[in-house]
């Protein structure tokens, strides 16, 4: 039995941490006073939004780059400074921030905007059109410039871009207020997939954020580590290792900071005097497992079913691999066993591409000589992680139980 004094010991140990000074500076939503290696991007975005200080509507902007390249941090950094300067000059400038992925639906996106404007929004009961009208009416009674940031905007586009189109036209309904949009996405191809009307409006200004290299990541990690950890809490090789690992994963600074934080938490739990390279490697595996589980949980049913099909199709392969055709055949069998209508091969291939982008699988095209080329797929995370996450879906419980746990994923330990 777990006794209260054991809980007290855990809390007591945490309160007198020898390692952490302020772990909050390693969290994803923390915006530091300085953003190393993003000076050009800060300058460019500041130029885009500067007209707001004159009461003019800034151009809409579209910001894209891979995960962890500083898009959100730079946007918040610039807009906070803009609002401070506007206040000092007596100008009326405000900004709203909505993470579209966290809000999940167009209704919740509009509701979040409305609430930030002081509007009381019922949880349900309104149509999208009525809610949009209420947000517009609220804005029309206000004055000044409003900059709306839609982070991870691709999650809104996937549900259709009608709301996005309406938002790009919002100034047609305003008299005293002005509004502009900043869309942030990880997908460099998203803008091309939009309705031409939305594309021309939202893409008035475009900013591209390149991945950080290992040296830049070391600078970022060193800056945050000096504020997050007590002096001497990190072994000498910790920051170079975290930077090197993150540089291999597309220069993702957010992931690098997560790994450093979790490595510190593992060391703290174990009562270690310092954070070591071993703590870093274990933190990376722990984060991969937790992230993969969260991603799989949020997949639509057929996405989960295709993932289960990868497990089934790759069971007989010593390398844990399967071709697209083998996976689709396994998917059709699973869909049939559940009485579900199957998606097309083209759609299934699209789902595989999305899973690849999310880091759950990896795929590549190989040559089979006179038989031509084919795409082979393998898991990029542990099969156990996939099976455990899929098992949480009651629809798939019976199917998943019949899957083996063979097939070593690429990079798994």
Task: Annotate each predicted stretch with a short phrase.
Residues 56-79:
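Walker A/P-loop nucleotide-binding motif
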Residues 80-92, 118-122:
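Post-Walker A helix-loop "phosphate-sensing" segment adjacent to the P-loop in P-loop NTPases
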Residues 1-58, 412-413:
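A short, basic N-terminal segment
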Residues 266-289:
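Conserved C-terminal helix/linker of AAA+ ATPases
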Residues 247-253, 261-274, 314-317, 335-336, ...:
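AAA+ ATPase "lid" subdomain C-terminal helix
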Residues 2-20, 27, 58, 101-220, ...:
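Mid-core helix/loop region of P-loop NTP-binding domains shared across ATPases and GTPases
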Residues 314-413:
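Terminal-proximal interaction/regulatory segments of ATP-powered molecular machines
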